[in-house]
Amino acid sequence: MSGIDASQLDLIVCSTTTGDHLVPAEACAVAERLGATCPAFDVSAACAGFVFALDVAEGYIARGRAERVLVVAAEQMTRALEWTDRATCVLFGDGAGAAVIEAGGDSPLAVELSTAPDVETLRVPGLVGTSPFKASADSASVLFMNGRRVFKFGVNAICDTVHKLASDAGISVEDIDHFVFHQANERILSQAVKRLGVPDERVVRTLRETGNISSACIPFALDRLASTDALDAGDTIALVGFGAGLDTGGYLLRWK
């Protein structure tokens, strides 16, 4: 879709927490499949990862280190689930999305990255090996989520980040044409939209198609928005991802 060849890429950044490998980086696997020879590495910021990866790409371009960066978000959340836990297994899915970021375009109108340090609310335990020096009660590395805590954090993260993006860009929330939020669950989206007071038709929803596909939610939803007649040149789009860590990433851009 970008009309460029893999040989023209200067960098590949991949956001994933559920890749095919712990080592090497999943971005290296993407580079191999594409036949690209540029540097490639991963960003791990859970469901906020795509926005964090966008900011990394923008930084490389702004410093003149790259002209074209492939940003990928790819997740297989189903491999991290406990399938007897209906509080989590019914929410998640697998998916991927990607974007090519090029020099010469407009910089984002505003960027907001934040962390509210918390490693307990939403987590997947580390490797369970066979070392005799470290016993583990975990039989598998599966996802744990405190749903109530995630709900409260998610609503606040969306609303606070949207207001900060608008303020930094010198516009009002009402001036933002489209909202692409992390698709955690419908309750979080509905409550955030209600609190923000924005028209529901401005908010992209893809949950019924994919479920929660972690960092791939935002590029997938952005692609869905781009394929409709609702998006016009010059429209402003607010991207907000939030997830384990507890990390939040916000990006305000103008569509061309």
Residue ranges and their predicted role:
Residues 62-96:
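Flexible, glycine-rich active-site loops centered on histidine and acidic residues
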Residues 18-19, 29-32, 37-39, 45-65, ...:
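Claisen-condensing/thiolase-fold acyl-transfer catalytic domains that form or cleave C-C bonds
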Residues 85-152, 156, 160, 242, ...:
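Condensing-enzyme catalytic core mediating Claisen C-C bond formation in acyl metabolism
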Residues 17-20, 114, 128, 186:
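Short glycine-enriched loops at secondary-structure junctions
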Residues 8-21:
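Short beta-strand-loop/turn "lid" adjacent to the catalytic site in phosphate-handling enzymes
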Residues 23-25, 81-85, 248-252:
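Short acidic, glycine/serine/threonine-rich loops at helix termini
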